[in-house]
From Swiss-Prot:
Protein name as it appears in the record: Armadillo-like helical domain-containing protein 3
Keyword terms of this UniProt record: Cytoplasm, Golgi apparatus, Membrane, Transmembrane, Transmembrane helix
One GO term describing the cellular component: Golgi membrane
Pfam families: ARMH3_C
Highest rank taxon of the organism: Eukaryota
Amino acid sequence: MAQIEKKVGLLRKSSASKKPLKEKVVLMYDEIFTKEDPTKSNPRFWDELFLMKVNIEYLESKLESLDGEELMKLKDNINSLFQHCIHALRAEHQIRVVNSLQTLCALIRGVHQKNKPTSGFDIINMLMGFDKAELRMKNLMESLDLLLCGDGSESLKSLCLKLLLCLVTVTDNISQNTILEYVMINSIFEAILQILSNPLSRRQHGYDAVVLLALLVNYRKYESVNPYIVKLSIVDDENTLNGMGLVIARALFEYNRQYTDKEEENQTGFFSALTNMVGSMFIADADEKISVQTNEAILLALYEAVHLNRNFITVLAQSHPEMGLVAVPISPIPTTPTSPLGTTPPSSDVISPTELPMDADVQTSNLLITFLKYSSIVMQDTKDEHRLNSGKLCLIILTCIAEDQYANAFLHDDNMNFRVNLHRMPMRHRKKAADKNIPCRPLVCAVLDLMVEFIVTHMMKDFPMDLYTRCIQIVHKVLCYQKKCRVRLHYTWRELWLALINLLKFLMSNETVLLAKHNIFTLTLMVVNLFNMFITYGDTFLPTPSSYDELYYEIIRMHQIFDNLYSMVLRLSTNAGQWKEPASKVTHSLVNIRAIINHFNPKIESYAAVNHISQLSEEQVLEVVRSNYDTLTLKLQDGLDQYERYSEQHKEAAFFKELARSISINVRKNVAFNTLSQEILLKEFSTIS
């Protein structure tokens, strides 16, 4: 019946002899759209309006049906509606506050839809009037601040955050949203922090608060001084920072859990049984169903916290009691085009008060572990632009972490060992690793595992050059810390070396295809210089002398790849062309690797001949290596332990502008979809005293 009434409210004429009855609120909306002052016929018009249940659909559709010129004629009444909405936010009766918040959402969205370049009106003038805009927005922001910080209803606080998200995301490009200038002047930063520092409000509103903060931080961040950036960078309150970390961790964990559930469904269901019978022809389709959109909004919030606030780094490694708690959905969360896996906030709408412990290793978990698991999922599939950007953002966050001295200290801390079960891409030539076999190790081992996994699994013709470059840079920065602090990490370095050698082999094998799109020599030089780092400084950070011997063994064993690489870069560096200079740099960087190969290979051949052995074992080769170090001459190479620090503004501005745009569109869709559960709200506030 309620739906019929809504539809009736949208009808202008009826084919029946009698006109259909309209809701009273619809009749009142019609009065607002008649150019006359509605209080002339009813002095209590505005008081009565906010006692009526809001019909968002009708109000928005009414605004949508008008062209710019018609809307301009109604400016005075729209200004009055906006003004009285703000006034109603201070009302004693909470039902009025609820209705005013919902009306503001509909009004802002509806008017913004008409704000096209051809419409000929200014959004601020249409909603508030130029002369009153500053005062109106000041009053609005103060009222929202009071509601968010007060002891009132949690539903009201939720509505306030929805309204703010609506306000921020009405334009795709948030930096073009002129209303946000007033949100900069009348800051709600402290209200957001208060939500994050309080366990109850954080659990109910933390997700919206964190996403709102991430968006506000990205408003004109390169053009002017953004107060939200300044304030976020200096937050040092432990409860607030931990609260923000918990919200992010919970959202990431929820994504990980949903992914794992879907993965298990695919492995245990009928589909899995069918593919086992007929082979692997359907495997790609199954994986495609699992590899769905990441939650970029929460990822952006994590990035801004890590990038802007050095105090937040401590939160990454901190274990919390709440980290072991996960909210149980009352019903399955729908996965829709506007609400992909992981983007549905773990809000109070879908969470029961009951909370259960996570899996067995949760008690030794933290935000960084949750993020690494999350990254291992989203970095698996980078075939489309959206997934590529998600993987890029994960690597940018890891880059910031790898550059931080304190972060490196806890990453390498032998007293902080964790078992991190990263997700691995299904590949035909390798078995699925058993999670229980993963040992407890310092967290940096999981970071390196993630980098190795990416290197091994993304060698394809549509080569993600940018992601590979970032991946190698992260490994390099970790090695620089180990060299500087003489940290001897017990890690399976051979896996990294083999991954890097196979990457070089891939780049050479696909030289023609890749050179048509990329300068492969920048990446090649970075990979070769990683080997140079190990050769030059490995004795200061490799765990044992035998590890250093194994490095030489792998270089000698795979010498054909290095020989082929040298031939390729020598060919291109001696020919005039665009690759002459970059190829020449790689040629020079190979000097020590070639010296090792040219020094040890004859000695290995001689050893085999003297001992009448056709094929030497690994131990025999290592014996030759150990006994001939003293006659090896290597060239000292400068700058191997230096790197350029990450800079967002100079190199990543375009990426973050586009990312903020994508998030704004997605948040707007989600807010529009479940902005306001009116039945729940009206039930809560049905008693008007």
